[in-house]
């Protein structure tokens, strides 16, 4: 079996006296779509933010595509490893976080130009293709303020893909959208999942998406992965009463 593209070992995260993550261990294979779900406060978003070190773990080790970083005091070498790890991860947030003063195409091109130091012609061609992939090529020269929430989130997905990450992290990407706009973002994510080109870790309460797209589901409870399995396993016969109670409440 090939090495996992994401490996998390003994991950702990505390904020003061509050322990939010209590020892997470998980391996995720290339091309896998892992849906993380659970009640508010169970540690889902903190888990994602620790993977790309937007939150610094209190304890544990994280490996993404061969770049391994352990918890500890910041050092020059560790900061370098974190920068390398982040180039392998793209992240889509609840809020779109697009640069309001930049056109859509410039938002998508920014990281490959500034961080990746790639040639402008190549970056522009790739960015236009990414916008076409998410159905936004006709809005390339618009500014974010002129877009709907669903359109902005689709641009945010294209922007995250522009650095050609090996892992995409989605932190409740539809939670800030009006109900009628959710489907357009989920459709883009489904096409990305169907391509099997990118590993996806998705925090969401959209159980229809999970049932259709996920290769694995992980139920977070009280800072731990209480149960994991295929959608068929968890929807039809969850082993934990907590998992069953949660699914009964949201389905």
Language-model features, listed with the residues they occupy:
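ABC family nucleotide-binding domain
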Residues: 4-231
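C-terminal boundary and immediately downstream tail of ABC-type ATPase nucleotide-binding domains
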Residues: 220-221, 228-251
């Amino acid at each position: 079996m090939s090495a996992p593209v994401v490996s998390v070992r003994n991950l702990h995260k505390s904020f003061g006296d509050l322990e939010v993550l209590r020892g997470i261990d998980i391996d995720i294979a290339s091309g896998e779509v892992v849906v993380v779900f659970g009640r508010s406060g169970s540690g889902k978003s903190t888990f994602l933010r620790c993977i790309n070190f937007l939150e610094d773990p209190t304890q544990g080790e994280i490996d993404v595509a061969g770049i391994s970083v352990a918890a500890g005091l910041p050092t020059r070498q560790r900061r370098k490893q974190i920068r390398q790890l982040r180039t392998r991860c793209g992240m889509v947030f609840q809020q779109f976080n697009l640069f309001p003063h930049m056109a859509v195409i410039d938002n998508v091109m920014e990281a490959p130009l500034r961080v990746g130091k790639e040639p402008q012609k190549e970056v522009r061609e790739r960015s236009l293709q990414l916008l076409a992939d998410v159905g936004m090529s006709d809005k390339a020269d618009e500014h974010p303020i002129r877009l709907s929430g669903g359109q902005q989130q689709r641009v945010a997905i294209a922007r995250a893909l522009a650095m050609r990450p090996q892992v995409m992290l989605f932190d409740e990407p539809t939670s800030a959208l009006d109900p009628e706009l959710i489907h357009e973002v989920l459709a883009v994510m489904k096409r990305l999942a169907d391509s099997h080109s990118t590993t996806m870790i998705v925090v969401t309460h959209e159980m229809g998406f999970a049932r259709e797209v996920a290769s694995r589901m992980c139920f977070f409870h009280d800072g731990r992965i209480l149960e994991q399995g295929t959608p068929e396993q968890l929807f039809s016969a969850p082993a934990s009463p907590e998992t069953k109670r949660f699914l009964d409440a949201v389905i």
